[in-house]
């Protein structure tokens, strides 16, 4: 049972449709080349073409102070195949993520790191891409993993015996706080994911780990016989779909809100966990949050 790679290829890239924008007007354009951010996870602060056609992408956080996780995701379209030089400008922040590129939203290729040129302070990163005619080229800090992916992935898991898919509540913007449960046992494993939007590698690791727990072998079956699973795969859906660096829609780091519970997302999940454990008289055996450095 390996759903992760399959789920990454679902129809996320309905590029003519925008989750946030009223229109799919380009952010900027030059001689037939257009830049868009009209998709889940798409976000840049601004962009500008020089007369020679060099594209400068401005990247800034949703608010400050903030951890340096400079997310970006945008797509390029061209009327004819065009070579486009690009500069990622982080202002006072430093370059961190080597670009990942995709034509179809299924297969991603990391741009050769050796071909990315950095300025002395590492606040700008330069590289060049070939944009095919009449097709979208997506450029992102990490391969995209958004609400659409999670919905399809969870749908696949719901076919497993005893699995129930539900919700702990809603985010500030009304997105679902997904919950997966298995039949309750004396002990429960709590799994948390995607508190920080750019941490897609941690999200993929979490998905792979969960799929391993549902394998049809002696070890996995023995585990499920003794331990219930309580999974919240995407705690910050607003930040994830908006392409934020770190925070939720109210500018809070949800991974620093376990205790104060000032945010709807952390409050909802804390309450849901407590209710689940109490209702089924189950003890929390372990809590895991898979992220990345």
Regions inferred by a protein language model and the residue ranges of each:
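Short, acidic Gly/Pro/Ser/Thr-rich loop/turn segments
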Residues: 95, 146, 238-239
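Extended acidic/polar, glycine-enriched regions
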Residues: 118-169, 183
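Active-site/substrate-binding loop(s) of hydrolase catalytic cores
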Residues: 162-178, 184-293
